[in-house]
UniProtKB/Swiss-Prot annotation:
It is found in: Cytoplasm. Keywords: Cytoplasm, Endonuclease, Hydrolase, Metal-binding, Nuclease, Ribosome biogenesis, rRNA processing, Zinc. It comes from the Bacteria. Belongs to the endoribonuclease YbeY family. Its cofactor is Zn(2+). It comes from Staphylococcus haemolyticus (strain JCSC1435). GO terms for molecular function: metalloendopeptidase activity; RNA endonuclease activity; zinc ion binding. GO terms for cellular component: cytoplasm. This is Endoribonuclease YbeY. GO terms for biological process: rRNA processing.
Length: 153
């Protein structure tokens, strides 16, 4: 089972967005060959909240589009317990997603899907701190989005 806990701090999120993101992340989970039970949360926030989170936890006093908190980093694996794998939290700023969708000329739904997948890949350990890692992560993103059928059109 793959459980996604959605939280909307904006009161703007459409129920269909939850279904699209859940479907995309289930597809990505299969593409990444994660076979065990897993769970994560996706929270939608505004610019003020994401800036505060970014400042508090990343020491960056600016607005951003998505922040991920991987709960498995540096955590020992507990073997033998019948518990799902807790991947972490994805926080998406809906205001920035809307602006980026306009800027890139694609739908808001496509941008939300892209940001959710980007955050999901971070939870799995992908990163883009250097050029080589960026190529790997962004290539994986594009492969999954294209296979899923969520294009920039």
């Amino acid at each position: 089972m793959f459980t996604i806990d959605f939280n909307d701090h904006t009161d703007l999120v459409n129920e269909s967005w939850y279904h699209q993101i859940e479907d995309l992340l289930n597809f990505a989970k299969e593409q990444e060959q994660i076979n065990e039970d897993a769970e994560l949360s996706v929270t939608f926030v505004d610019k003020n909240e994401i800036q505060e989170i970014n400042k508090t936890y990343r020491d960056k006093d600016k607005v951003t589009d998505v922040i991920s908190f991987a709960l498995e980093e540096d955590e020992p694996e507990i073997v033998g317990l019948d518990m799902p794998r807790v991947l972490g939290d994805i926080i998406i700023c809906t205001n920035v997603a809307e602006e980026q969708a306009d800027s890139f000329g694609h739908s808001f739904e496509r941008e939300l899907g892209f940001l959710a997948l980007h955050g999901f890949l971070h939870l799995l350990g992908y990163d883009h701190m250097n050029e080589e890692d960026e190529k790997v992560m962004f290539s994986r993103q594009d492969t999954i989005l294209n296979a899923y059928g969520l294009t920039r059109d």
